């Protein structure tokens, strides 16, 4: 197992905090390997509080000096445009993700159709390397299971609220 897989396994574990929205993220000092911050989806509190934003906010409030650090963001899914832009503004030099936006879309997840690669390309003032597909099958399985559960739960709620029976 390489370092990217090790940290992605941690992101997958963090995603378990919200199994219906399994977006887990962590920020690592790429030189020392120290985990600086962790996060997961908290959109039930704030619609912009994605896993990546949670990790970035945690790092910002930690008091850790990040200027000049080789920051790496690990996340179970390719960052949406908001999260990728936040990573750039935060000085993150590398983003490593599992599931792609395209894969999420194929599984039924609503996504803004702008890839992280395009956000980076349109932001020449920053350098940020993207590495996708790390433990992709494991991450894809997380999102497929969550989507199945979300669809099954909403069907059940609709059935019960319309007077149907679950017997």
Predicted regions located by residue number:
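Helix-adjacent hinge/juxtasegments
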Residues: 57-94
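Short beta-strand scaffold segments in enzyme catalytic cores
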Residues: 23-33
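Short beta->alpha transition motifs characteristic of CBS
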Residues: 34-43
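A short, polar/charged loop-to-alpha-helix boundary motif
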Residues: 43-58
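Zinc-dependent deaminase
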Residues: 1-18, 86-167
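Glycine-rich phosphate-binding loop at the start of an alpha helix
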Residues: 5, 49, 53, 77, ...
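Short helix-terminating capping/connector loops at secondary-structure junctions
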Residues: 20, 65-69, 123-124
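Conserved hydrophobic/aromatic pocket- or pore-lining residues that grip, position, or stack substrates
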Residues: 11, 24, 55
